[in-house]
From Swiss-Prot:
Keywords tagged on the record: Eye lens protein, Repeat
Any GO molecular function: structural constituent of eye lens
UniProt key word Repeat: yes
Domain Beta/gamma crystallin 'Greek key': 2-40, 41-83, 88-128, 129-171
Family as reported in the entry's similarity comment: Belongs to the beta/gamma-crystallin family.
Annotated SUPFAM superfamilies: gamma-Crystallin-like (SSF49695)
One Pfam match: Crystall
Descriptive protein name: Gamma-crystallin F
Primary role: Crystallins are the dominant structural components of the vertebrate eye lens.
GO annotation, biological process: lens development in camera-type eye; visual perception
Domain text: Has a two-domain beta-structure, folded into four very similar Greek key motifs.
Higher taxonomy: Eukaryota, Metazoa, Chordata, Craniata, Vertebrata
Positions of the UniProt region annotated as Connecting peptide: 84-87
Length: 174
């Protein structure tokens, strides 16, 4: 079970809302979000309702302002609690429809280019666990949540291009 608290003001001040499950529309509970406290679980936050728009992955911890979660503004309109899974395994392919060179990954990777010489990934096969894909190396840039399943082309995970810099398992290390 997870627990996250959203605060309208920086530094955990102002009106707040506590949440322990997925919410497709947080607008009725707060008008802006400038700080967050994650007491348990891993969460994906979305700037738009219905799990749309830019995404932000948060683990247990305190985020006193939106820059701490790499946010571009104070808009959080939906959230998803990421289920805990024991093992993680995915396959990346350099071309669409699982073509080209394939690599299987079971651990976080801060630079796909340095480790595998990939700067673009066109398809994924998420076999176990939930993953967070980052557009840039060292877990920076746009983020995308990958749940178990098939991603035949980059549009399937919501991206506008095939640029992938790093991957991280969606796990709470505490």
């Amino acid at each position: 079970m997870g627990k996250i608290t959203f605060y309208e003001d920086r530094g955990f001040q102002g009106r707040h809302y506590e949440c322990s499950s997925d919410h497709s529309n947080l607008q009725p509970y707060f008008s802006r979000c400038n700080s967050i406290r994650v007491d348990s679980g891993c969460w994906m936050l979305y700037e738009q309702p219905n799990f749309q728009g830019p995404q932000y992955f948060l683990r247990r911890g305190d985020y006193p302002d939106y820059q701490q979660w790499m946010g571009l503004n104070d808009s959080i309109r939906s959230c998803r609690l990421i289920p805990h899974t024991g093992s993680h395994r995915l396959r990346i392919y350099e071309r669409e429809d699982y073509r080209g060179q394939m690599v299987e990954i079971t651990e976080d990777c801060s630079s796909l280019h340095d480790r595998f010489h990939f700067s673009e990934i066109h398809s994924f096969n998420v076999l176990e666990g939930w993953w967070v894909l980052y557009e840039m190396t060292n877990y920076r840039g746009r983020q995308y949540l990958l749940r178990p399943g098939d991603y035949r082309r980059y549009h399937d995970w919501g991206a506008t291009n095939a640029r992938v810099g790093s991957l991280r398992r969606a796990v709470d290390f505490y």
